[in-house]
Curated annotation (Swiss-Prot):
It comes from Arabidopsis thaliana. One of its GO terms (cellular component) is mitochondrion. The gene is EMB2745. Belongs to the PPR family. P subfamily. This is Pentatricopeptide repeat-containing protein At5g39710. Pfam families: PPR_1, PPR_2. NCBIfam families: PPR (TIGR00756). The keyword Repeat applies. PPR repeats lie at residues 133-167, 168-203, 204-238, 239-273, 274-308, 309-343, 344-378, 379-413, 414-448, 449-483, 484-518, 519-553, 554-588, 604-638, 639-673. Keywords: Repeat.
């Protein structure tokens, strides 16, 4: 006790404090201990020297220091030196949270390197007075780093090292973390890490995790993996955070399978994936549209005892919305609410976007109301999504009502919002209103972009006013806005629709001259124009050109070409082209069979039959059924070929009931069964034990004389050979013999 008092007296002697300062300090101490409400009487005359005196006298009394800090902090006498003394004391007591707040207050006042040097000097001068440790420098460096004052943080590190102090791994980790968070160039972090090693500071698992996160964020997964491998050789075992960071890095690079492998390898290191691990993988799968695989991950999560949290549900809902699976998104939303979890603004915006995309604006508004009830504020994107949804349907009154609410809630419409309104007016054919919105944008200080002008231009093209569309193109060029591929494609399509193919071709040539690559819409418009003119050679030439240039034809392109070929009785070429939709890699993956089916009304009858055959060969009977039914809906009566293909397809797929139903329809319509179809149907019925149906088919075939004697014999032999059972055949033959219908070729 005597030694402590002696040291304090010695410390106080280093300050040039007057007796009056000492008296003030003693008086404040008395008030702090007994009458804290009297302290305000001292505030006006209290000096920085008195404050320093008080702090040093009471540096071993934690409660007293905290009381003084609470009183002194807002006052001017609590200077930088006083704050540095307080930081030393708080750190010594390990009151890191309170110390952090004070240190960040000091850091926030640092405007230049000179002040940072002053901070260090004050810490250095008061260091011995408080018997401090180097951890105080770690604390200050961390505070500068948390405020993203990275250069100032490093200057404190360098000053400390130059004066014999040893900032440790915490200081370097703080600087590295701030560097990554501020998205500074990753090379800066590499240099800091190199400096850290040169300073003999050993990295820990947090250091490596920070660096791995930085390299993953920069898209340099290879360097991140090198660090991952180096960790263990340096005695740092990767933890779950390390793995999660790398898995996320893989997912962001669309290397989800590599991410999965890493997830599986965690068990080899004795680590178990946590909820974040699974959420990262689910997010990667959702972004890639691999929603079927998500169910396997969810099953594994459930097996390991993890419940879905808000992040999981929000990710799943967004993923299902992106996929267009609105039903499953709504199921997830309902399940989320049942578990007492709150969807985020992003989740609701995704649901609203999905409903708008589906044209269900009533449901979209219901979700907006739900947001309000749950205390969530729609953001600019939410409102813009609704404005776009109403505009797409031409409900402009509702779109403007949402716009007013958007303004009332403090959100200024963006260029994207105005573009949605412009599009709405173009959809409804009110081009004057579209131009008015364009002018309104300019008045509000927003510059129309290429989308704004292209939308107006496209609107004029749809209104068959291509000359006005050309004027808009000239205006945008004068304003310094370069037309893009969409601009030219809209104009080309507009001219093609008016049979002004020469001008469309001139625009195409101009497009190439300015270095804009044509897309599938550009090519399809021109191909359609040539097909309409009967110039199939030029149309096919353009088709070949687009494939050579890596522009993948879509289903509309193929529909146009197939129709053109069929109209000129070039059926074989039409069929060959149609088969590309099934077997050639040059066909884009986003040409969905659903889209193809929807375009059946635009494809000639013979090609539709080929389409059915393609689906049956692939075992895609649901799609084949849809095409078959679409034929009936379009007054295209299926012929015998279509029925034979469908019956055979369903037999192969194992749907005997459907095959037999089609067989009865076919017989009723008077079409002939092919030998292969009969054999397939008989085999399938026999396999399923459908004796009555089997008898019916055989009797019909043999009595109808649809097949030749050789074909009839082939059917019967096939049954015996394949099934090893002649009982049914003999029964049928006996019945036919009675009626005099025994085939001549069978004895």
């Amino acid at each position: 006790m005597f030694l402590t008092k002696t040291l304090i007296r010695r410390s106080l002697s280093t300050f040039a404090s007057s007796p009056s300062d000492s008296l003030l300090a003693d008086k404040a101490l008395t008030f702090l201990k007994r009458h804290p409400y009297q302290l305000h009487h001292l505030s006006a005359n209290f000096t920085p020297e008195a404050a320093s005196n008080l702090l040093l006298k009471s540096q071993n009394d934690q409660a007293l220091i905290l009381k003084f800090l609470n009183w002194a902090n807002p006052h001017q006498f609590f200077t930088l030196r006083c704050k540095c003394i307080t930081l030393h004391i708080l750190t010594k007591f390990k009151l890191y949270k309170t110390a952090q707040i004070l240190a960040e207050d000091v850091a926030a006042k640092t405007l230049d390197d000179e002040y940072a040097s002053l901070v260090f000097k004050s810490l250095q001068e008061t260091y011995d007075l408080c018997y401090s440790t180097s951890s105080v420098f770690d604390l200050v460096v961390k505070s500068y780093s948390r405020l993203s004052l990275i250069d100032k943080a490093l200057s404190i590190v360098h000053l400390a090292q130059a004066h014999g102090f040893m900032p440790g791994v915490l200081s370097y980790n703080a600087v590295l973390d701030a560097t990554i968070r501020s998205k500074r160039n990753i090379s800066f972090a590499e240099n800091v890490f190199k400096e850290m090693l040169e300073s003999q500071v050993s990295p820990n698992v947090f250091t490596y995790n920070i660096l791995i996160r930085g390299f993953c964020f920069a898209g340099n997964i290879d360097v991140a993996l090198t660090l991952f491998d180096k960790m263990e050789t340096k005695g740092c075992l990767p933890n779950v955070v390390t793995y999660n960071t790398l898995i996320d890095g893989y997912c962001k690079l669309r290397k989800i399978d590599d991410g999965f492998k890493l997830l599986r390898s965690m068990a080899l290191k004795g680590l178990e994936p946590n909820l974040i691990s699974y959420n990262v993988v689910i997010n990667g799968l959702c972004r890639e549209g691999r929603m079927k695989e998500v169910s396997f991950v969810l099953t594994e999560m459930n097996r390991r005892g993890y419940s879905l949290d808000e992040v999981t549900y929000n990710t799943l809902i967004k993923g299902y919305c992106k996929e267009g699976n609105f039903h499953q998104a709504l199921v997830m939303h309902a399940e989320m609410l049942r578990h007492g979890l709150t969807p985020s603004v992003i989740t609701y915006t995704s649901l609203i976007h999905s409903m708008c995309k589906a044209g269900n604006m009533n449901r979209a508004m219901e979700f907006l109301d739900q947001m309000r009830v749950r205390g969530l504020c729609p953001n600019e994107r939410t409102y813009t999504t609704l404005v776009d949804g109403f505009s797409q349907k031409g409900y402009m009154n509702e779109a403007y009502r949402v716009l007013r609410e958007m303004n009332d809630n403090g959100f200024s419409p963006s260029v994207v919002t105005y573009n949605a309104l412009i599009n709405g007016h173009c959809v409804t054919g009110k081009m004057e209103d579209a131009i008015a919105v364009l002018e309104d944008m300019k008045e509000k200080g927003l510059s129309p972009d290429v989308v704004s002008y292209s939308t107006v231009l496209s609107g004029f093209c749809r209104s068959y006013d291509v000359d006005e569309a050309l004027r808009v193109k000239r205006e945008m060029v004068e304003k310094g806005i370069k037309p893009d591929t969409i601009t030219y494609s809209s104009l080309i399509q507009g001219f093609c629709e008016q049979r002004r193919t020469k001008e469309a071709c001139d625009l195409y040539e101009e497009m190439l001259r300015v270095g804009l690559p044509p897309d599938e819409f550009t090519y399809t418009a021109l191909i359609n124009a040539y097909c309409m003119e009967g110039d199939l050679e030029k149309a096919l030439q353009l088709h070949n050109e687009m494939v050579e240039k890596g522009v993948l034809p879509d289903v509309v392109t193929y529909s146009v070409l197939i129709n053109g070929l069929n109209k000129q009785s070039r059926t074989r070429e039409a069929k060959r082209l149609l088969l590309k939709l099934f077997y050639e890699e040059s066909v884009p993956s986003d040409v969905t069979y659903h889209t193809l089916i929807e375009n059946c009304s635009n494809i000639e009858f013979k090609s539709v039959v080929s389409l059915i055959k393609g689906f049956c060969m692939k075992g895609m009977m649901t799609e084949a059924d849809q095409v078959f039914e679409s034929m009936l809906g379009k007054n295209h009566k299926p012929d015998g070929t279509a029925y034979n293909i469908m019956i055979h397809g369903h037999c192969r797929a194992g749907d005997i009931r459907k095959a037999y139903t089609l067989y009865k329809e076919m017989v009723k319509s008077g079409f002939l069964l092919h030998t292969v179809t009969v054999i397939a149907l008989v085999k399938a019925l026999h396999k399923e034990g459908k004796v009555n149906e089997l008898n019916s088919v055989i009797v019909h075939v043999l009595r109808s004389c649809e097949l030749s004697e050789a074909e009839q014999a082939k059917v019967l032999v096939e049954i015996n050979h394949r099934e090893g059972n002649m009982d049914v055949v003999l029964d049928v033959l006996a019945e036919m013999a009675k009626d005099g219908f025994l085939p001549n070729g069978i004895s």
